[in-house]
Curated annotation (Swiss-Prot):
GO cellular component, one term: ribonucleoprotein complex
Entry keyword Manganese: no
Name of the protein this chain belongs to: Small ribosomal subunit protein uS15c
Location(s), subcellular: Plastid, Chloroplast
Organism ancestry: Eukaryota, Viridiplantae, Streptophyta, Coleochaetophyceae, Coleochaetales
HAMAP family the UniProt entry points to: Ribosomal_uS15_B (MF_01343_B)
Gene Ontology BP terms: translation
UniProt cross-references to CDD domains, sorted A to Z: Ribosomal_S15p_S13e (cd00353)
Assembly description: Part of the 30S ribosomal subunit.
């Protein structure tokens, strides 16, 4: 799917710990925790963890926006994330 496309392209260009890989990983965790919270609405520790993950992903995307705008746009469009600015 989209993550496989990102993974294959980023492995050819960058290392596994690249910003793009981290954003993909965090996005997968966000989706998983969001689904968990739909079932368990009062799981406040998961809500707090989700906010922390979203903050980290936002910081990474801000860094990517400043460093390489074309990669930023590609990641945003591939993952279906709203743009920061």
């Amino acid at each position: 799917m989209l993550t496989n496309q990102l993974n294959s392209e980023s492995k050819n260009i960058n290392k596994i710990g690249s910003i793009e890989e981290q954003v993909v990983s965090l996005t997968q965790r966000v989706k998983f925790i969001s689904n968990h919270l739909k079932i368990n609405k009062k799981d406040y520790s998961s809500q707090r963890g989700l906010r922390k993950i979203l903050g980290k992903r936002k910081r990474l995307l801000t860094y990517l926006y400043k460093k390489d705008f074309l990669k930023y746009k590609f990641v945003i469009q591939s993952l279906g994330i709203r743009s920061l600015k």
